[in-house]
């Protein structure tokens, strides 16, 4: 049975669990009332529930129906005959007077869930899937509230999941004609599938016997037998809530041992364990006792949220604070006690470990594992919170606290671990630290580093990446390079590749394109990347995109186009960059895939690369490369035919030319298209204006500088397009006129035209003084002749179609 079904009160096995036994045996009723009232109608599996109150109108009514003796009215009426019952006529009169009943938070939550159940039942009659979806989302949020308040999983929630699951399975989408309702149906189907998978055991139990699901008895969890010292706690089980309060007569270590033995048990109550450990911390006398208490409390807090999608934020902060308090104790007693993974196991908690040669008592524990788990829970929360809400920004503020803890853990390990084992054991801390900074600019890294070093004790120093007091640009570069090199020396291939890719990403992001490119080619990390872990493949794809953006910032258009071309040809760009939502992955993945595997396939929203910016950069590069080449090819110049890609500008232009009605540009794609049409006309100013009007450029940190560099390239490519298009109308063109028309220096025009003539073997040359472009007439067909030939072919085809017999006779 799941631990959510555990109760905290003692249960007498002699008392009957069925309602019919209540009717037949007054002795059992008496024994039941003496042992403690047992609620069969409890909707929660982990707590007992008192009988619900009823209005006087209902209580006066006569019970009816075949199971009338099971009605609450019958049981309430019978209570006044029990020993010790406080039922009286005055109670009835109080209820008749209409006194307000104050409900607990749990009862209010149950009422809200019951209201959801009723609304879904009503919506079922009219197939109102939009209401069903809204109410299902509501009860999902209520479940989170219930679990955050340690109420467990209410049975009414299981009922609603089963109810919606049955509705989905009994309905067919083909019968739904309304598009909005059909969309709501699909969304409901996906969400209920995911939640049903997470609560599979409870649903199976409900479907096995729905009627007795609410009335199932709960059993007190079995605890290990107590020794002679523990005989202060007698009876059928140990009440953990009174454990710490009895510590004046019951030793701290014995209490801690009982808590440790209770952890991981089937019916153990995590909330009570945490409360007990917090009370034990208040009475702990020695540093050794406080260290042991924290080493038990921290993992217990983490275990409490095992079945949740992420640890609730208030619990996460409590765990974070506990870990910092543990570090405070360890820092104060660093010469006496140290927590390390290299210590020997000590089965006897009451006996402190023997001091080593340096007089230090080593306690077995992994502080880094606690920090890693907190970091995982932090990432999970970011993946599950709506990235467009204020909650996400609020949660993101905790990243600084998380990074402070990572740095503190690393520095403590450097101070306590033998030098020969440091680099191996610190690798996990290095990769976590690198994961938090590799995608940030130097300015952001400087802020987070300065804040982190201020938060850790000043006595700590790092020999791997020394901190001089100010995280300037040079320090940030040395930090990423130092962490990457240290990880590259590890035997673990995964860590080696991840460190290398993170280093390349950081280098490209901060404007060093050539260095990043050489590093990628030198390490050959791209070989066999398809066989690597999914998270590595995602990081590699991110590196490729960042390299393309870095090349574009430096106006290396050809290299940018070449780098991004293959990646943007994919129809699943969001997926291969790890930028799809966790919920979408869960709905599309098979039931066999674990939540950990799904989390590897996506990144928190603040780490995403803006796909609109990537599209804009690629299409702009495509515009500058393809429009001149396409114009040259279509005007009869012998040149290599431009291949057509999915997002190439040539495809957009061809589609645009086939349409008749053209509105003003709205999307990024349309702005680039209109810029291409302006370039074809030789209007470089219009081309630049259309590109500059796209607001997505503001996402580049140096957007003004990038657009200024782009201006000259647009002028040159527009000039080349103009020459290819209109050369048949000229015998010679003045360089000075071109300089005025395209706002380019004359020497730049001469250099460009010399290169074009050499590459394409045009019948064009410069005069001796290089003041004119002389165009030699060749055999090329003029535009008018092209239209005439085309029209002649169409006339002939039409004539043959209208007079087939005349054509055959001839």
Curated annotation (Swiss-Prot):
Function summary: Component of the eukaryotic translation initiation factor 3 (eIF-3) complex, which is involved in protein synthesis of a specialized repertoire of mRNAs and, together with other initiation factors, stimulates binding of mRNA and methionyl-tRNAi to the 40S ribosome. The eIF-3 complex specifically targets and initiates translation of a subset of mRNAs involved in cell proliferation.
SMART domains: PINT
Amino acid composition bias (Acidic residues), ranges on this chain: 34-58
The protein's assembly and partners: Component of the eukaryotic translation initiation factor 3 (eIF-3) complex.
Keywords of the record: Cytoplasm, Initiation factor, Protein biosynthesis
Biased composition (Low complexity): 12-33
Entry annotated with the keyword Cytoplasm: yes
Annotated InterPro entries: EIF3C (IPR027516), EIF3C_N_dom (IPR008905), PCI_dom (IPR000717)
Start and end residues of each stretch annotated as Disordered: 1-98
Domain of life the protein comes from: Eukaryota
MF annotations from Gene Ontology: RNA binding; translation initiation factor activity; translation initiation factor binding
Cell compartment(s), UniProt: Cytoplasm
Positions with biased composition (Polar residues): 1-11
PROSITE patterns xrefs: PCI
Protein name: Eukaryotic translation initiation factor 3 subunit C
Family label: Belongs to the eIF-3 subunit C family.
GO biological process: formation of cytoplasmic translation initiation complex
Residues annotated as domain PCI: 605-780
Gene name, Swiss-Prot/TrEMBL: NIP1
One GO location term (cellular component): eukaryotic 48S preinitiation complex
């Amino acid at each position: 049975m799941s631990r959510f079904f555990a109760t905290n009160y003692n249960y007498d096995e002699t008392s009957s669990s069925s309602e019919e036994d209540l009717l037949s045996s007054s002795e059992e009723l008496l024994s039941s009332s003496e042992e403690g009232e047992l609620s069969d109608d409890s909707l929660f599996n982990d707590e007992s529930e008192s009988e619900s109150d009823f209005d006087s109108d209902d209580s006066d009514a006569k019970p009816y129906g075949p199971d009338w003796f099971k009605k609450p009215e019958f049981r309430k009426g019978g209570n006044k005959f029990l020993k010790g019952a406080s039922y009286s006529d005055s109670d009835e009169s109080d209820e008749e007077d209409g006194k307000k009943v104050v409900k607990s938070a749990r009862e209010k939550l149950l009422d809200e869930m019951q209201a959801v159940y009723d609304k879904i039942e009503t919506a079922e009659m009219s197939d109102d899937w939009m209401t069903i979806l809204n109410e299902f989302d509501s009860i999902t949020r209520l479940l989170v509230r219930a679990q955050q308040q340690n109420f467990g999983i209410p049975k009414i929630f299981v009922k609603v999941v089963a109810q919606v699951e049955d509705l989905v399975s009994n309905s067919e989408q083909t019968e739904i004609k309304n598009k909005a309702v059909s969309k709501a149906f699909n969304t409901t189907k996906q969400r209920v599938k995911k939640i049903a998978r997470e609560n599979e055991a409870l649903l199976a139990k409900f479907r096995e016997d729905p009627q007795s699901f609410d009335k199932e008895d709960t059993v007190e969890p079995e605890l290990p037998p107590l020794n002679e010292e523990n005989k202060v706690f007698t009876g059928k089980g140990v009440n953990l809530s009174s454990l710490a309060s009895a510590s004046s007569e019951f030793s701290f270590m014995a209490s801690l041992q009982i808590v440790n033995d209770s952890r991981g048990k089937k019916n153990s109550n995590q909330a009570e364990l945490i409360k007990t450990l917090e009370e034990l911390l208040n009475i702990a006398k020695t540093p050794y006792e406080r260290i042991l208490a924290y080493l038990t409390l921290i993992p217990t807090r983490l275990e409490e949220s095992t079945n949740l999608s992420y640890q609730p934020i208030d619990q996460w902060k409590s765990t974070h604070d506990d870990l910092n308090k543990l570090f405070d104790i360890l820092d104060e007693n660093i010469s006496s006690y140290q927590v390390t993974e290299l210590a020997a196991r000590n089965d006897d908690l009451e006996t402190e470990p023997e001091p080593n040669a340096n007089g230090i008592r080593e306690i077995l524990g992994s502080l880094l594992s606690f920090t890693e788990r907190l970091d995982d829970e932090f990432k999970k929360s970011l993946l599950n919170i709506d990235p467009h809400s204020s909650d996400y920004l609020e949660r993101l503020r905790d990243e600084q606290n998380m990074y402070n803890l990572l740095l503190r853990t690393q520095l403590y390990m450097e101070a306590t671990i033998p030098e020969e084992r440091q680099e191996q054991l610190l690798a996990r801390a290095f990769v976590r630290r690198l994961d938090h900074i590799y995608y940030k600019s130097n300015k952001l890294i400087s802020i987070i580093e300065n804040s982190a070093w201020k938060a850790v004790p000043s006595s700590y120093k790092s020999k791997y990446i020394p901190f001089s007091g100010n995280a300037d640009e040079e320090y940030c570069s040395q930090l990423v390079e130092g962490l990457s090199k240290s990880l590259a020396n590890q035997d673990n291939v995964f860590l080696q590749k991840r460190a290398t890719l993170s280093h390349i990403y950081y280098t490209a992001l901060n404007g060093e394109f050539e260095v990043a490119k050489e590093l990628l080619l030198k390490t050959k990390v791209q070989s066999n990347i398809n066989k690597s872990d999914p998270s590595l493949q995602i990081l590699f794809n991110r590196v490729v995109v960042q390299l393309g953006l870095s090349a574009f910032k430096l106006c290396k258009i050809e290299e940018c186009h070449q780098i991004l071309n293959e990646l943007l040809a994919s129809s699943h760009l969001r997926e291969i960059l790890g930028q799809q939502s966790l919920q979408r992955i869960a709905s599309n993945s098979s039931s066999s895939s674990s939540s950990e595997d799904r989390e590897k396939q996506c990144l928190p929203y603040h780490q995403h690369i803006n796909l609109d910016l990537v599209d804009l950069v690629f299409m702009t590069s495509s515009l500058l490369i393809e429009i001149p080449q396409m114009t040259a090819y279509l005007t009869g110049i012998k040149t290599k035919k431009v291949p057509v890609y999915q997002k190439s500008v040539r495809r957009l232009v061809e589609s645009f030319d086939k349409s008749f009605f053209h509105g003003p540009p709205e999307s990024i794609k349309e702005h680039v298209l209109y810029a291409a049409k302006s370039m074809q006309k030789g209007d470089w100013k219009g081309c630049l204006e259309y590109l500059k009007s796209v607001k997505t450029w503001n996402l580049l940190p140096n957007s003004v500088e990038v657009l200024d560099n782009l201006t000259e390239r647009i002028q040159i490519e527009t000039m080349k397009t103009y020459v290819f298009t209109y050369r048949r109308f000229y015998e010679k063109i003045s360089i000075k006129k071109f300089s005025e028309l395209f706002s380019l220096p004359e020497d730049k025009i001469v250099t460009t035209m010399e290169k074009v003539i050499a590459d394409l073997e045009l019948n064009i040359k410069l005069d001796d003084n290089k003041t004119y472009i002389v165009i030699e007439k060749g055999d090329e067909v003029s535009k008018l002749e092209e239209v005439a030939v085309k029209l002649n072919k169409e006339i002939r085809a039409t004539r043959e179609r209208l007079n087939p017999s005349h054509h055959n006779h001839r």
